[in-house]
């Protein structure tokens, strides 16, 4: 079974007669025996690897909230309102996974969830001389494999004179590198509400 163990430290405080509230938490979560797909099988098998308890993860995250609530008289009746802002973030890495070849298409130890591998862009080719002096990358450009001025120039990270993905493994990624991450970062939420004369409204916005 999948098991999660979380360690958490934080604080909560109320100031100005409980009108101002501040809370902060930092946590680290270890997930073991995560239920997920197994390492990819050769294409000759004609099917995907079965799922199982194949991976372990480590997550670091934090949450911060600041709130204010108060009341005053409006039209002879109490008008109360509250506003609360929250922001949080988390990152997760694979700590265990059976991937003996280090294939980039699967989980591997040290992989950050959501990471995007790709080629680093150096700009655009200015002219034919620029193309001739750069690493060979014609197979990345067009169906006719001809590189032309104005097309994207990719970085030759391993300095082997050609732009490719190598063995597509952690040991030999060719010119591939991590160029981004699709996991949302620095999520936020805002809660606003008021109550007056038996009428109450509460709203919540959330984004990244």
Where are each of the predicted segments found?
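A near-ubiquitous, low-amplitude feature marking generic local secondary-structure context
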Residues: 47-49, 102, 175, 182, ...
């Amino acid at each position: 079974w999948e098991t999660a163990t979380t360690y958490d430290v934080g604080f909560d405080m109320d100031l100005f007669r409980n009108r101002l509230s501040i809370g902060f938490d930092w946590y680290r979560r270890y997930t073991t025996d995560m239920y997920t797909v197994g390492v990819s099988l050769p294409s000759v098998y004609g099917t995907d690897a079965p799922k199982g308890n194949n991976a372990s993860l480590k997550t670091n995250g934090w949450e911060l909230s600041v709130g204010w609530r108060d009341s005053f008289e409006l039209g002879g009746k109490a008008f109360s309102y509250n506003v609360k802002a929250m922001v949080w973030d988390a990152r997760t890495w694979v700590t265990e996974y059976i991937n003996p070849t280090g294939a980039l298409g699967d989980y591997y130890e040290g992989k950050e969830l959501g990471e995007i591998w790709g080629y680093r862009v150096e700009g655009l080719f200015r002219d034919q001389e620029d193309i001739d002096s750069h690493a060979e990358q014609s197979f990345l450009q067009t169906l006719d494999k001809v590189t032309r001025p104005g097309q994207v120039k990719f970085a030759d990270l391993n300095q082997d004179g050609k732009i490719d993905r190598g063995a597509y493994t952690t040991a030999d990624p060719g010119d591939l590198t991590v160029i981004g991450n699709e996991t949302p970062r620095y999520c936020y939420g805002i809660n606003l509400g008021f109550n007056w004369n038996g009428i109450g409204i509460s709203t919540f916005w959330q984004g990244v």
